[in-house]
Amino acid sequence: NPNGPNTPAVSRSWFRRQAQATVQAAHKAGRTPWIMPQCFVDVWGPWKYDEHLNALMLPGSVLHWRQPTVGEIRWQVWSAIGSGMRGFFWYVYLPPAADRPEAKPYVGSTFPPSLAVKVPTPALGPGGLLKPDGAATPECRAAAEAFAAVRPLLPLVKGVVPADSPAGKVS
């Protein structure tokens, strides 16, 4: 994304900082902290759904936002809970209802023309936690599994306030 963090390390750092700031603001206001992690694909230019209902970038398009991997979805859940979040709602649950195979190829200054795909290229997801037909994606199942793993821990985390800064760093 040209409007935010681009490397995985910078993106994770940004997510944690924003989660911590949200938790602090919610606690200061006497509110329960919620977070809205992203799980979508944003293709600029022509694209269509393939036979598995995943987005397929067509020649002339660029990938503006990519859908998080299954591992990144799990990480979003656990990292947010570790920051003190107590609620989640995802952006987005349902991907676009209709693809855009007839869209004009990307033209602009945000991305260099060399980033436009030359051949149909998978965007690695439908653009939401669910597919256009309402079926769960692997990312949706990963979020559900993470929430199921958290459930037995709820008595331990309810009422816990996170430390001001991380106790350590794992790289």
What are these regions (language model features)?
Residues 1-13, 76, 83-91:
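Aromatic- and acid-rich polysaccharide-binding/catalytic face
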Residues 87, 91-171:
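Aromatic- and carboxylate-lined catalytic core of secreted/periplasmic carbohydrate-active enzymes
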Residues 46-49, 77, 92:
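Intrinsic disorder/low-complexity segments enriched in polar/charged and small flexible residues
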Residues 21-71, 98-101, 106, 122-132:
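Active-site clefts of carbohydrate-active enzymes
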Residues 21-33, 79-86, 142-156:
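A structural motif corresponding to the C-terminal end of an alpha-helix
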Residues 14-15, 25-44, 88-93, 154-168:
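Aromatic-lined carbohydrate-recognition surfaces of secreted/lumenal glycan-active proteins
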Residues 8-22, 66-74, 139-146:
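Well-ordered, non-membrane alpha-helical segments in soluble/globular domains
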